[in-house]
Curated annotation (Swiss-Prot):
The gene is ureF. Keywords: Chaperone, Cytoplasm, Nickel insertion. Transmembrane segments: none annotated. It comes from Actinobacillus pleuropneumoniae serotype 3 (strain JL03). UreD, UreF and UreG form a complex that acts as a GTP-hydrolysis-dependent molecular chaperone, activating the urease apoprotein by helping to assemble the nickel containing metallocenter of UreC. The UreE protein probably delivers the nickel. It comes from the Bacteria. PANTHER family: UREASE ACCESSORY PROTEIN F. Belongs to the UreF family. Required for maturation of urease via the functional incorporation of the urease nickel metallocenter. This is Urease accessory protein UreF.
Length: 227
């Protein structure tokens, strides 16, 4: 039960890290009329899951989890730098490392793991940025959480964020949002299975539509979100 409690704390939407401030380009998709219904929002989140997250944030989380288990700080720093290079849009890039640094600041108070302290020092010395998936993986492994459950929680948390923002932006009913999340159960499990041992040839695969909308978001006349 202790591990379940730790995992729930890690994905708690009330964590004061500012995740609710980011749409990662979804706001642009909505303003352009690309996402305008329950069906299009469901297609959007499933596309993000199976064509973006499993090759980017989820894959890097998986690799960072293994590096943390091997006490390999050098590999963690390398993964953080590679993830930085894969995040083309400035707002999404900055948003991710701000979330990561805040998450680390919270959980380093509870987990006495030397790599967390060393990584925080590396962030302070600007040897890395501290991207959210990397820090999430490090904290989860420091708490001895199961890798598959960590990946599922990470993906579910990301999906909830997209659906919550989509329901607000389109707008849709709360029940529409719940139906979308229910339909994600099988895709989420598949994404976890695909991410346990990421295919390095697909690491950082481009997501052009999302990257373009994320960059266009900087120029929107009105917006609710920071990315």
């Amino acid at each position: 039960m202790g591990q379940l409690g730790a995992l729930l704390h890690l994905v708690d939407p009330t964590l004061p890290i500012g995740g609710f401030n980011h749409s990662n380009g979804l706001e642009t998709f909505v303003q352009q009329g690309k996402v305008n219904s329950r069906a299009s929002l469901e297609e959007y989140v499933q596309t993000q899951l199976m064509q973006n997250w499993i090759y980017n944030d989820g894959a890097y989380l998986s690799l960072a989890f293994d590096a943390m288990a091997n006490h390999d700080l050098g590999r963690l720093l390398q993964l953080d730098q590679e993830l930085a290079a894969s995040k083309i849009a400035r707002e999404s890039r900055e948003g991710s490392y701000k979330l990561g640094v805040r998450l680390l600041k919270i959980f380093i108070r509870y987990e006495n793991h030397p790599l967390l302290s060393e990584f925080q020092q590396a962030v302070s010395e600007k040897r890395c940025q501290g991207y959210f998936p990397i820090v999430f993986a490090m904290v989860a492994q420091a708490m001895n959480l199961d890798k598959a459950e960590t990946l599922y929680a990470f993906y579910y948390n990301a999906a909830v964020g997209v659906v919550t923002n989509g329901v607000k932006l389109v707008p849709l009913s709360q029940m529409d949002g719940q139906d979308i999340l229910f339909a994600l159960r099988t895709p989420l499990a598949q994404a976890v299975e695909n991410s346990l041992n990421p295919d390095l040839d697909w690491l950082g695969a481009a997501t052009l539509a999302s990257d373009i909308r994320s960059m266009q978001h900087e120029q929107l006349y009105t917006r609710l979100y920071m990315s």
